[in-house]
């Protein structure tokens, strides 16, 4: 695992593929992503371009992503990981982490955030007691 990496949080979608490509071209080999960042498709475009242009091979990169809070149940983990792989355009991740150790009730991938976070005067969390 490379000692220095690029965190991909808050990189705007319209700049993300260029930022990732430029970072790889500069020498970054560790990319830290997450489905919650909302830009994994664009990250994947930057990775693909760097690979297609011969800047790097896939096995020279260390790509990390993270499982979001609403997908902690065992029946959702594989689907969440496969969605991340599809969005990134990759066949594998080097590391897949639990983004935050609080399990929330399931919300479909398209929504990602529980409705009680956004559609209420009193935002809150409905935790899900996920067995370990």
What annotation goes with each model-predicted range?
Residues 34, 72, 127-130:
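Short, surface-exposed alpha-helical recognition segments that flank or form part
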Residues 9-11, 34-36, 66-70, 98-101:
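Active-site beta-loop-alpha junctions enriched in small/polar residues
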Residues 1-61, 75-79, 91:
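N-terminal binding-site loop/beta-alpha segment at the start of enzyme catalytic domains
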Residues 78-132:
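Glycine/proline-rich, positively charged
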């Amino acid at each position: 695992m490379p000692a220095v990496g690029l965190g991909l949080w808050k990189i705007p979608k319209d700049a993300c593929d260029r930022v990732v490509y430029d970072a790889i071209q500069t020498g970054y080999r560790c990319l830290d992503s997450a489905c919650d960042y909302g830009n994994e498709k664009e990250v994947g475009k930057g990775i693909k371009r760097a690979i297609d242009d011969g800047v790097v091979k896939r096995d020279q990169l260390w790509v990390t992503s993270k499982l979001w809070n609403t997908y902690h149940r065992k029946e959702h983990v594989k689907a969440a990981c496969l969605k991340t792989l599809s969005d990134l355009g990759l066949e594998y991740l080097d590391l897949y982490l639990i983004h935050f150790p609080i399990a929330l009730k399931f919300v479909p991938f398209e929504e990602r955030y529980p409705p009680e976070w956004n559609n209420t005067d009193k935002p809150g969390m409905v935790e899900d007691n996920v067995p370990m």
